[in-house]
A protein has these predicted regions:
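Beta-strand-centric surfaces of beta-sandwich/beta-rich domains
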Residues: 1-120
């Protein structure tokens, strides 16, 4: 039986609540699904802050994907390589030295593959 595939563009936005490391996470990939990211993009709309770390999070374990040591304010940083995010995992991006009320954006573009026996 063929896999069912849906194209997705998943935008996320968060306002940092206190000074320190700001973190934004995607939703966890649902059971029976795999998210194939063809592009992952991050920005801090508010200001130039500390280093950006992009990773895949699976429970308490993280797998690093990219690192940007000196990002500019309100500039998109993209990870253009195809990345498979399995069920239960999520994409996470952290930025050091954020201040309260910084606005962080994360956008995932790609497609979702469904197991043949999973209803959408």
């Amino acid at each position: 039986m063929a896999k069912i595939i849906d194209s997705v563009r998943l935008p996320y936005s968060v306002i940092v609540s206190a000074s320190g490391t700001g973190t934004i996470r995607s939703d966890r990939v649902k059971t029976g699904q795999m998210l194939v990211c063809q592009s992952i993009a991050f920005r801090n709309q508010t200001g130039a802050r500390g280093a950006i770390t992009l990773q895949i999070k699976q429970s308490a374990v993280t797998y690093p994907l990219a690192y940007e040591p000196a990002p500019a304010a309100n500039e998109w940083y993209t990870y253009p390589y195809e990345q498979h995010v399995n069920e239960g995992e999520q994409v996470e991006c952290s930025q050091a030295s954020c201040i309260a009320d910084d606005v962080l954006d994360l956008v995932l573009i790609g497609y979702v593959e469904y197991k043949a026996d999973v209803k959408r």
